Amino acid sequence: MKGIAILGIMLHNYCHWLKGIARENEYTWLQWKNDRLWEILQQPDEWLPMHLVSYFGHYGVPVFLFLSGFGLVMKYERSGQPEASFWRFTRYNYLKLFRIFIVGFVFFTMLDAFTPGIHRYLASEVLAMLGMYANFLEHPSEVVWPGPYWYFSVTMQLYILYRLLFHRWHHWGIVVVLMVGCWLWQMFYLDDSETLERLRYNLVGGMLPFGMGILAGRWSERLEVFCERDGQQWVTCFVLLLSMFLTFLFSFLSSQTWLWVPALIVVGTIALVKLIPSQVMPYVVWLGTISAAIFVTHPIVRKIFVRPYIHEDMYAGLLLYVVATLLLSWLMKKIIDQIPNPKL
């Protein structure tokens, strides 16, 4: 799942910068973006794959949030590991994210300083980025740079929420209430783009897939029994096709249904993983092993390649971007691995 998710994120964050390519509804829902994609689907052009990954690729983030929730349950509830205090838990998970974040952030800001389109930080914004609370600031889309690094702040928020609430009380109802409550909170501000953006930059927007991950982790044994039944491949195919259909439908239907698309993406990704041929699976798994490095590296490579290819030869630029990102991510992982892992 990590391999598929990071591929979508990496391609999305390049393609949505290109001129004439469809734009996504990620933090807010704007009808004109749907209208634009619908026009393209009715009269497809040679850039159709780019349009699709630009519009849908950002949904790799909910997949990672799902995996974060699942991983927390496996680590802190199923492994028999001694319970850590709130401070130790928070420190450990912050440092775990920071060792990935800091390598990419340093390289990116150094490159950004002498290339066109420099982002000038305020001192308070740098501290917020380093402290992983930048998403709380006003207009986070103008503060967080590179843009994909908003993920670190929302992940840290969800880790803290887990330790304060879900780790202490294991009843599934608490998770469901928070998921529904965060959905209703977003519903209330659907017509207020500025507030909705701030909510979706923070844990309110990430609670749905994260909560699904927690529930999946706690019910993993029952889910495994169901998935191992005979004839499940046909069911898996049906689930994948249904998820794809509903993703398209809910994305276009209304802003209310759009809020549920991350859940459909998670279900569809699980089904897709189960259908990947054995010959292809090792490559997808390999992408997953370097996914953290890809996440912090791809904005650096994008800054280099997107401007020369923003209008013409866009597939050539995309190919160069992908090749360079994979190679540099492999090297970046080696640098990250040299930083000691925090101890719980």
Label the predicted regions:
Residues 82-87, 107-116, 132-143, 189-196, ...:
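Short juxtamembrane and helix-loop transition motifs at transmembrane-helix boundaries
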Residues 70-80, 164-169, 187-188, 212-224, ...:
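Structural signal for the C-terminal ends of transmembrane alpha-helices
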Residues 48-61, 140-154, 189-212, 244-269, ...:
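Interfacial loop-to-helix transition and helix-capping segments at the boundaries
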Residues 7-14, 110, 130-136, 178-191, ...:
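Aromatic-anchored segments of alpha-helical transmembrane domains
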Residues 169-176, 227-237, 282:
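Membrane-interfacial entry segments at the cytosolic side of transmembrane helices
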Residues 210, 237-341:
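Alpha-helical transmembrane segments of multi-pass integral membrane proteins
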Residues 1-183, 310-344:
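Membrane-cytosol interface segments of multi-pass membrane proteins
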Residues 157-166, 170-215:
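Loop-centered beta-sheet repeat module
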